[in-house]
Amino acid sequence: MANRPAASALAGARSPSERQEPREPEVAPPGGDHVFCRKVSGVMVLSSDPPGPAAYRISDSSFVQCGSNCSMIIDGDVARGHLRDLEGATSTGAFVAISNVAAGGDGRTAVVALGGTSGPSATTSVGTQTSGEFLHGNPRTPEPQGPQAVPPPPPPPFPWGHECCARRDARGGAEKDVGAAESWSDGPSSDSETEDSDSSDEDTGSGSETLSRSSSIWAAGATDDDDSDSDSRSDDSVQPDVVVRRRWSDGPAPVAFPKPRRPGDSPGNPGLGAGTGPGSATDPRASADSDSAAHAAAPQADVAPVLDSQPTVGTDPGYPVPLELTPENAEAVARFLGDAVDREPALMLEYFCRCAREESKRVPPRTFGSAPRLTEDDFGLLNYALAEMRRLCLDLPPVPPNAYTPYHLREYATRLVNGFKPLVRRSARLYRILGILVHLRIRTREASFEEWMRSKEVDLDFGLTERLREHEAQLMILAQALNPYDCLIHSTPNTLVERGLQSALKYEEFYLKRFGGHYMESVFQMYTRIAGFLACRATRGMRHIALGRQGSWWEMFKFFFHRLYDHQIVPSTPAMLNLGTRNYYTSSCYLVNPQATTNQATLRAITGNVSAILARNGGIGLCMQAFNDASPGTASIMPALKVLDSLVAAHNKQSTRPTGACVYLEPWHSDVRAVLRMKGVLAGEEAQRCDNIFSALWMPDLFFKRLIRHLDGEKNVTWSLFDRDTSMSLADFHGEEFEKLYEHLEAMGFGETIPIQDLAYAIVRSAATTGSPFIMFKDAVNRHYIYDTQGAAIAGSNLCTEIVHPSSKRSSGVCNLGSVNLARCVSRRTFDFGMLRDAVQACVLMVNIMIDSTLQPTPQCARGHDNLRSMGIGMQGLHTACLKMGLDLESAEFRDLNTHIAEVMLLAAMKTSNALCVRGARPFSHFKRSMYRAGRFHWERFSNASPRYEGEWEMLRQSMMKHGLRNSQFIALMPTAASAQISDVSEGFAPLFTNLFSKVTRDGETLRPNTLLLKELERTFGGKRLLDAMDGLEAKQWSVAQALPCLDPAHPLRRFKTAFDYDQELLIDLCADRAPYVDHSQSMTLYVTEKADGTLPASTLVRLLVHAYKRGLKTGMYYCKVRKATNSGVFAGDDNIVCTSCAL
């Protein structure tokens, strides 16, 4: 609509004959009147209408429907005088039409009478906040409104008006709005308005300009139909405001606040003249209460000297002090605002923002050497967070006057996070906002780029430092482009600050380096370190693959940076911590097989090879099969394992990144029963207890063949245990060769024979009680390896059971990891396979750079690493992607998507590895020995494999046979427990463990809700039904299936199942569907639930393990997690050890 005049309250409403036709809405100029309210307490209508600003109180604001501490717009002005409630609509008096335009709400109109008004009525439209927007007022160009009405009687004093009203300049100037930085004045549109303006000028002695205060993020241009004020009783007459985005600090929206009474003869304020108008000192109608309120609003006497002491700094007429952040100025403004900050917690932020803006005009552009300082954008980001929290009706503490310093701003953010953290269990919005506050807290500990690059604790690579200096200007521009506040203002995607509280805390507590005593590298600096190093070490062939040409360092930097910062690709934890530094240890997984046969040799291997790996925080899979010299009544391996247990505990005690070790044995080892009893309550005596290490069984097919015979009803099925003297060759063979040798030893009467069900029960009991042993299938691993291992069979895996490598006394298996975030590939419920291919390609290039540049802790590790160049590209967020697409893991659509994703990942990874060889890189050392040399693929050994990209596979086959592959193995599906937290997605390929993750530590409770579920609940329920639904979920451990059993099977909420709600055989089948395209293995956890009586039948786990064996998996069980029958949580084994190496 065209700009309409501000309707003078003294000018009555136009008659129906004078109404004009509605006009098209248009953006109004900045400015406008505000209404502030506090929950359902009184509402103050503030007018900037000449001849003098005045405030009018609406005593009952229940009809406003505006929530807590909202900022609303008045499209026009209101009549001078007192507004009081009107029970019924009448045709006399002034009206205030208040429109509720919140999302989903219908417009509502409240009619309020203007006391003592004798002229026609006038209306004022008040628009509340729209969903997702925070509104600032916009003024209207004055327009003649008819004859002036007789001034109304003076209003009675309003209790809180003095606290948010305008303040008079400390030197006696005109009264200004709090926080105003610019003046605004509408030219008179009629003689009567001109006279009023002149009269106002005489009263105040400083002109008729009015200034505004605002503390919200968004600006709005209010629109109204020209005839909307003709009938305030009609809902249809109230039109929503048109929202115009602008930065909250770009300038105020004009608002005139009521003049406080100022003592004209006060010795403490010698230059202050007496105010005029209702409630002023010269107004004989002012009451004693009004006088007291006005006096309380006056600045203190010590404000003026502050002004005089800083003559070179610009002074904002809305504040009694210069726009310079000093303790004296901040305290003066705090006294100036008084108790108003209790109603408007962010009131101090506008002063901080104005000061920061003034400072930015004086400082040069940011460089590497620029000292970190809080900027206008930082205060704006905090203000955005506070405004969002106020929309949630939270009672916020006021921003302290010293919060302009990094330390006190950090303390204030911490107070908010700790205070409201428990509420994130029911609010996805609050979960996101608290994450923003943690990122702001990180910002307060940021150092300059120069300090960061020179830090000994960070210890940047020399070559990287030189490259960063060469591109200083570009990096500063990129840093500003990724400013979170700018991204919020311009609706630019910034997934970093959108990921939520857990993501931000994980960055702060774990991934960001500390240096210089109290500094912390920023998230931008961390990803600059990683991407910059990758760009430095990228070869010419890699640049051609990534960019399609020979690009520059800066182009390669951006290629990696954006995919890392956006979490399309995620490095492993050691890579994220060490890439770009001179600590070049980035490998995650180590497979060690010392083949020691004596106690002394085993101890040397543990204290030498194993200890060196632990010192570099590597996760270890240790094969102990060869050490098997038990004598009757003793366990040969347990003393050595006790040494290993103590060694792991010692390394983890002072480490910020704990690691672990897993001991692999075959089930015929003479000490297998002792190992199954070495953890937790199963440990018979302290000398046998090993709570800091894990165990895993390397199961041959023969064991399950016999177990199935027992389950089918066959009697007296046995299993034999052998010691070293009779079993030296068993570990070297697999398949039929192993079975022949094993049965031959039995036939000769060697070994100890036990019922097979006894050992099966011991395995299941240990798994259900301690979470381990892990179970891997020896024959499946060796059967699908890239070359024949008969006679030197692979004897173990890594700590998390997803890496497949041969290892021996001379060579240890080593793998470098990375993962792709599948949830980032979903857009509008569609999976983008093009983005997936791009992410896998980038991940393969990243891991190859890691392989080229990493150091190894031992010669054995270096030998195995260089010979095979093995990588493990994993996935995270599979379940999150499924939910974002509106699918269920049980659906046929997802079963197809699951296989499709796995095939694309392997295809893209192998094509990239082959492209490196095409561009001149040498194939891995054992390529000619591998099945790839003959043109065979991993998936071709699976009868259920049906690739959909047969043409691409055939082209790759020909190129692979001609040029080779740079890497020996590609896809390994690890848990991604740590990195999934900073991505804020589900771990690996597993379903969500729970819809509300809760962990209590000495630092408090950590909560991570399923935000997709919370949003779906809000779409489904409302009001009390929503609260009831969440109460039910709380009572049922956030299991939708148990809390809301009455939902229709097709209801969208039915999709939000936890891992325990799914049939575990289905999860095994999903792993089997992916298996042809996973050339390493999958860390498959089983989730089982106790029966109502608190028991867990052994047959439950046995049945699942047999099913995994029959489906041909390599990993039968990583963890076994048990949901207790009572509401006491989930037992997942001993969590004193957290693998952050292989688990990413």
From Swiss-Prot:
Extent of Low complexity compositional bias: 205-216, 279-305
SUPFAM superfamilies: PFL-like glycyl radical enzymes (SSF51998)
GO biological process: deoxyribonucleotide biosynthetic process; DNA replication; release from viral latency; symbiont-mediated suppression of host apoptosis
Swiss-Prot/TrEMBL keywords: ATP-binding, Disulfide bond, DNA replication, Early protein, Host-virus interaction, Inhibition of host caspases by virus, Modulation of host cell apoptosis by virus, Nucleotide-binding, Oxidoreductase, Viral latency, Viral reactivation from latency
Tagged with keyword Plastid: no
Site (Important for electron transfer): Y1118, Y1119
Segments of skewed composition (Pro residues): 141-159
Ranges of Basic and acidic residues composition bias in the record: 16-26, 164-179
Leader sequence residues: none
Site residues, Important for hydrogen atom transfer: C589, C815
Catalytic activity: a 2'-deoxyribonucleoside 5'-diphosphate + [thioredoxin]-disulfide + H2O = a ribonucleoside 5'-diphosphate + [thioredoxin]-dithiol
SS bond list: C589-C815
Biased composition (Polar residues): 119-132
EC number: 1.17.4.1
GO molecular function, one term: ATP binding
Residue ranges annotated as motif RIP homotypic interaction motif (RHIM): 55-75
One family name in Pfam for this protein: Ribonuc_red_lgC
Site (Interacts with thioredoxin/glutaredoxin): C1139, C1142
Binding-site positions, substrate: T573, S588, C589, G619, N798, L799, C800, T801, E802, P975, T976, A977, A978, S979
Region ranges (Disordered): 1-33, 118-324
Positions of the catalytic residues: N798, C800, E802
Organism domain of life: Viruses
Summary of the function given for this chain in its UniProt record: Ribonucleoside-diphosphate reductase holoenzyme that provides the precursors necessary for viral DNA synthesis. Allows virus growth in non-dividing cells, as well as reactivation from latency in infected hosts. Catalyzes the biosynthesis of deoxyribonucleotides from the corresponding ribonucleotides. The N-terminal region confers antiapoptotic activity in differentiated cells such as neurons and is important for viral reactivation to increase neural survivability. Prevents host necroptosis by targeting host RIPK1 and RIPK3, thereby hampering the formation of necroptotic RIPK1-RIPK3 complexes.
Free-text comment on this protein's domains from its UniProt entry: The RIP homotypic interaction motif/RHIM may drive self-assembly into homomeric amyloid structures and mediates interaction with the RHIM motif of host proteins RIPK3 and ZBP1 to form heteromeric amyloid structures.
Quaternary organization: Heterotetramer composed of a homodimer of the large subunit (R1) and a homodimer of the small subunit (R2). Larger multisubunit protein complex are also active, composed of (R1)n(R2)n. May self-assemble (via RIP homotypic interaction motif/RHIM) into homomeric fibrillar amyloid structures. Interacts (via RHIM) with human RIPK1 (via RHIM). Interacts (via RHIM) with human RIPK3 (via RHIM). May interact (via RHIM) with human ZBP1 (via RHIM). Interacts (via C-terminus) with host CASP8.
UniProt name for this protein: Ribonucleoside-diphosphate reductase large subunit
Gene it is expressed from: RIR1
